[in-house]
Regions:
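N-terminal Rossmann NAD(P)H-binding glycine-rich loop of SDR-like oxidoreductase domains
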Residues: 10, 14-19
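Catalytic loop of short-chain dehydrogenase/reductase
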Residues: 88, 95, 99-103, 125, ...
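C-terminal helical subdomain
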Residues: 176, 183-184, 195-234
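Conserved glycine-rich Rossmann-like NAD(P)H-binding loop of the short-chain dehydrogenase/reductase
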Residues: 24-40
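The beta1-alpha1 cofactor-binding region of Rossmann-like NAD(H)/NADP(H)-dependent oxidoreductases
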Residues: 56-67, 99
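A short helix-coil junction within the Rossmann-fold of NAD(P)-dependent oxidoreductases
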Residues: 24, 75-76, 92-93, 119-128, ...
Length: 234
């Protein structure tokens, strides 16, 4: 049985990751900003009281992040896989985006992942094969943007491109700890962020993601893959 920690787990892809991983008989630390109002997570906890722990963690607040992992470390906990899933989107284009909105997106999508990664190192070291999965997007691929020339969501696209660099750099920085780091795009998913026109239902996207991660070779790190496991250009 593996131990998995997921940020932003109260809804969308994070919640579905939690649900499907529990069905695979693993243990899940489901984190979110306000556990008291995470009603769906609470219902899930009623189903899996011995394998689901709900933790308070606000990726925008370093004290919150540090406190969460410090408590886990003191409790002797470890995690095998970390999903940096928490994220937000703004569809504004170059002429529309406001500075405060761009700062907010970077704080959640990039800084949040950095803080969680940094403070999770001690509990990841308790695993024989620790893995960090940063939830990215094809919208963060510089090469693909050049091919399609799609506009809009400029802050989100930039934040995911930056997240991919975080993946690459931390895969190097964490190599001495034997911690692997990858980026994975879930595809275009029907969530609050993705909208109703998206390609995948949440259940389908997460099933594909988890299947591809189970097949990921143990020596793979510092790569960007899709929901199908195929590599995506940076």
């Amino acid at each position: 049985m593996n131990k998995i920690l997921i940020t932003g787990s109260s809804r969308g892809i994070g919640f579905e990751l939690t649900r499907q991983i529990l069905r695979k008989d693993h243990f899940v630390f489901a984190t979110c900003r306000t556990p008291d109002s995470a009603h769906e997570l609470k219902l899930l906890h009623n189903q899996y009281p011995n394998r689901l722990t709900i933790l308070k963690l606000n990726v925008e607040d370093e004290e919150s992040v540090q406190s969460c992992f410090k408590q886990m470390e003191q409790d002797g906990e470890s995690i095998d896989t970390l999903f940096n899933n928490a994220g937000i989107i703004d569809w504004s284009n170059l002429e529309q985006i406001e500075a405060i909105a761009l700062e907010k997106i970077y704080k959640v999508n990039l800084l949040g992942a950095l803080l969680v990664t940094r403070h999770s190192i001690p509990v990841l070291q308790g695993s024989d094969s620790p893995l960090i999965v940063n939830l990215s997007s094809r919208l963060g691929s510089i090469e693909l943007r050049g091919g399609t020339k799609l506009g809009g969501a400029i802050a989100y696209q930039c934040s995911k491109a930056a997240l991919n660099m975080l993946t690459k750099q931390t895969s190097i920085d964490l190599e001495p700890y034997n911690i692997r780091v990858i980026s994975q795009s879930p595809g275009w998913v029907k969530t609050e962020m993705g909208g109703n026109e998206a390609k995948y239902e949440t259940t389908e996207a997460v099933t594909m993601m988890l299947d591809s991660l189970e097949k990921l070779p143990q020596d793979k790190t510092g790569i960007f893959i899709g929901e199908d496991g195929k590599e995506i250009p940076w």
